[in-house]
């Protein structure tokens, strides 16, 4: 509510999660991957191993290369191929899939033992969150559409599809 009222009044509000979701909605974002893990965001262990992200640093099972030798592009391509949203059949009928993309790989690994598994334990929460953000977006579009123009000039970080 605070974020929405600030946007309608043309003021900055620091709740970036809402702003990012509204930006994704405004720009028609449809994510093939939930985050930058294995794409542009990677983690490095103290031994120099490069992993999917900071949460997997030190895990041999999620290693994509080393600082010395660089990223193993074949391993990276295999990871991206198997983790593409199109392969998450549990998500195939979900209306929130373009913004969620199945959720965090580390959470899936921790909860299900499989990074390819969609995070089904928080689907209802994600749908509720997306619904709230859609309603906030609609009200801002109705009451202060000029506020949304900032997203016309500021593209999101490119998502791999």
Ranges and model annotations:
Residues 1-25, 54-101:
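C-terminal accessory region of radical SAM enzymes
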Residues 10, 47, 86-161:
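Radical SAM enzyme core and accessory elements
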Residues 27-31:
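Short, flexible cytosolic linker that couples an ABC transmembrane/permease module to its adjacent nucleotide-binding
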Residues 32-33, 79:
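Residue-level detector of alpha-helix boundaries and kinks
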Residues 35-38:
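Short, small/polar residue-rich loop motifs at catalytic or cofactor-binding pockets
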């Amino acid at each position: 509510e605070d974020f929405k009222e600030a946007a309608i009044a043309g003021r900055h509000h620091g709740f970036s999660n809402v702003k990012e979701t509204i930006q994704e909605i405004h720009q028609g974002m449809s994510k093939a991957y939930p985050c930058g893990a294995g794409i542009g965001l990677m983690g490095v262990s103290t031994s120099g191993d490069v992993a999917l992200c900071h949460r997997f640093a030190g895990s041999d099972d999620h290693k994509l290369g080393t600082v010395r030798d660089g990223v193993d592009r074949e391993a990276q391509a295999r990871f991206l191929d198997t983790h593409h949203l199109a392969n998450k059949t549990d998500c195939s009928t979900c209306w929130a899939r373009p913004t969620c993309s199945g959720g965090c790989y580390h959470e899936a690994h921790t909860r299900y033992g499989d990074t390819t598994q969609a995070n089904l334990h928080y689907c209802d929460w994600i749908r509720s969150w997306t619904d709230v953000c859609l309603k906030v977006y609609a009200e801002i579009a109705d009451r202060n559409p000029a506020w949304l123009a900032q997203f016309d000039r500021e593209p999101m970080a490119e998502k791999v599809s």
